[in-house]
Amino acid sequence: MDDASERAIEEDMLDQFNYFDDEDEELIDRREPASLDSFDLVDEEPDEDEGESTEPPQSSRLNSLLSRAPMHHGVRAGALHMKTDWHQIVTAGDELAVDAPLTDKSSIICRTGMLMLASGTGAWRVRDTMNRVADVLGVTIHVDLSLLSFECTCIEDGHCFNEVVSLPTTGVNTHRIWMMESFLKEIETYGRRFTVHEYHEMLKTVESSKPDYAPWQQGLAAACACGAFVFLLGGGPIEMACAFVGAGVGNFARSHILKQGLGQFSALTTGVALACVSYLLALLGLGQVIPGAMSHQEGYIGAMLFVIPGFPLITAGLDIAKLDMRSGIERLSYAVSIIVMATLVGWMVAECVGLAPDDFAPLGLSPLALTLLRVVMSFVGVFGFSVMFNSPVKMAAAAGLIGAVSNTLRLTLVDAPTMIPFLGLSTGMPPEAAAFIGALVSGLLASLAEVKLTYPRIALTVPSIVIMVPGLYLYRSMYYMCTFDTVNMLGWFVRAVLIVAFLPVGLGVARTLTDPRWRHTS
């Protein structure tokens, strides 16, 4: 059967489904919808003269056409999220962007917002970025943001255009945030001279940028960060060494799985499970050469702290502070989901292999030695987390210096009676208040560094206070819940929630004091 016959049959099929006669002008003359029986494509009683035809009956040809339709069962080979080819939707690419049609201006604005949202930054920064681009293009916009999507309405000269953009997943990329900041400075200076295609070429450069670090480098960064984290929690050399191995293996596996395009929770559970098992194997290995090494099992919690969602937790609080409730609640829900999944997997593995979150043994260090080591380990921890967020080395070092000051100050305030004995204090500052002060100091120092180094403020503040997130408290609360110890579970949970709540409050206060645009609602 040739192509012309197939097209004729397809047109006949479409004509059968025309319920109404388009040529009739009056409603009374329209045909009534036919019953479903009349649409039987397979004629069970063929006419007598059909038997004399040399061509196959029409019903057979219809069945042949329908059988050729592609059928999809099981796993699809392609991605389920459709990717936008921005160059194909541009109508006036060689025209200056300020004089382009509203649809082309909307594509520039929405692509800019998409790249910022995909970088993991908060709703206020995404909206601010889109507003600045729209201001250059002479467009008024209204944006409704969530964790993975936004709806943007563009208004210009009495015309209105609405566009929706969605992402397949979320993550953190501070280097891309920095690139977008440079892009904004460029267009705010020369943006009226660029064509639509030139805008999209600049945005394509940002979008196609590769991660700065390979999975093994991400694993090494997590190993250093979690090893330092264990010391700051009170662990010793054995716990630090085993956490180094566990976190390195776990985050390497997690980064490799994410690089393959698999789901975040699959990577999360695999990474946490491997981290706990690797910690135990490293502990067994040390037990062969160090007597009593098996008594240092409590450090396994530190091996899984690389999954703590510091960026979503902090940006959720900042979004809620700016009344971006939809984005803030979704980010908070996402962060809580990660914490719950990670702690459940950690508890399950710990129960299977016999690990328990006991208290760390005292190290017996002098106040001066402890303070100096806290400064060093805070720097190492923040530097490692910054690398995990894809910060360039210099940016990670700047965040590490800020974290070394603010986190050491926080820990010193909590342990004031022993760290500053000449003050004669009987008790230290509550951890919640100390977390607020630490976050406030991080925000103020980041404001100074932003002026000198041109790094985005959020790329410095969030990594510097991620190390203050009470991952140990969160895990212990879930552990005691799974063991039905309600009293301990509530105690650790309330402590963790209060500390997490005060961290974005401290950053928000610092931002309010130093950023006029943040202070005002419009």
Residue ranges and their predicted role:
Residues 166-243:
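Hydrophobic alpha-helical hairpins/lids featuring a short glycine-rich hinge
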Residues 269, 297-303, 314, 327-383, ...:
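Core mid-bundle transmembrane helix pairs that form the ion/substrate translocation pathway
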Residues 10, 15-20, 29, 34-39, ...:
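C-terminal transmembrane helix-loop-helix hairpin of multi-pass membrane proteins
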Residues 228-233, 249-257, 273, 277-286, ...:
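Alpha-helical membrane-inserting segments
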Residues 220-224, 244-252, 272-273, 375-381, ...:
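Hydrophobic alpha-helical segments embedded in the membrane of multi-pass proteins
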Residues 197-210, 223-235, 254-262, 353-367, ...:
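Short juxtamembrane and helix-loop transition motifs at transmembrane-helix boundaries
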